[in-house]
Design a protein with these regions (language model features):
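Glycine-rich phosphate-binding loops of nucleotide-dependent enzymes
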Residues: 2-229
């Protein structure tokens, strides 16, 4: 799997959400994508997944152009997505959520995400952390080539975050790449060998997490000023 984002610009009216962003991801890989609020992280996932139409630039998955495809067409190419607010079918059971539209055996995916004992419960009865795990199980059940995760640890406490991080560690299976948007930098540092930073719609850093705190552009983005060296 090879994802190539080349010079992508996305505008919403007078607002430039992404400006000339270039990024490449191979497999297996778990790429962290971070940045302050409003940096363009979710918009980049939307552009890859067909939910936002770039004004300029191209996006290719294994040589296939994604830029003009609808979300369902992108999904058929092997791209799966989770969202900041989990999108699950609340009137269906947990196992029905995983099986829906796929015809797969939900058992292995529920076991992998710690939801096996709740398989017959309605999804509406799940707590926030369980809902996030269910959405991840749904995404993984399609055995995607590219997995886009938008703040899967958002709103979770320390114990729940540790449990989710353990699940995410195994998400970049052979033949799959993962782009992980996450505000909790300790999760990024633990899971990712590479991290890209967006600020005001532009990519300002791309490298190992250990180098984040030494980069003046990253410090400027997060602190509003460059830290003296």
């Amino acid at each position: 799997m090879s994802l190539s984002v080349d010079g992508v610009t996305v505008r919403f009216g007078a607002t430039t959400a992404l400006s000339g962003v270039t990024l490449s991801v191979g497999r297996p890989a778990l790429l962290g994508l971070v940045g302050p609020n409003g940096a363009g992280k979710t918009t980049l996932l939307d552009a890859i997944g067909g939910l936002a139409r770039p004004e300029a630039g191209t996006i290719h998955l294994d040589g296939t152009a994604l830029t003009r495809l609808a979300p369902d067409a992108v999904a058929r190419l092997g791209v799966a997505r989770t969202f900041q607010s989990p999108r699950i079918f609340t009137r269906m059971t947990v196992e029905e959520n995983v099986r829906a539209g796929r015809g797969v055996d939900p058992g292995p995916w529920l076991a992998a995400t710690g939801l096996e004992e709740r398989r017959r419960d309605l999804a509406s009865a799940l707590g926030p952390a369980e809902a996030r795990r269910l959405e991840l199980a749904r995404a993984l059940a399609g055995e995607p080539r590219l997995l886009l995760l938008d703040e899967p640890c958002g709103g979770l406490n320390a114990t729940e975050t540790e449990a989710m991080a353990a699940l995410l560690a195994g998400s970049a299976a052979p033949g799959r790449a993962v782009i992980l948007v996450e505000h909790k930098l300790r999760v990024i540092g633990r899971l990712c060998e590479r991290v890209a930073v967006l600020h005001l719609g532009e990519k300002i850093f791309d490298g190992p997490p250990a180098d984040l705190h030494a980069d003046p552009r990253v410090l400027e983005a997060y602190l509003g000023r460059a830290r003296a060296s």
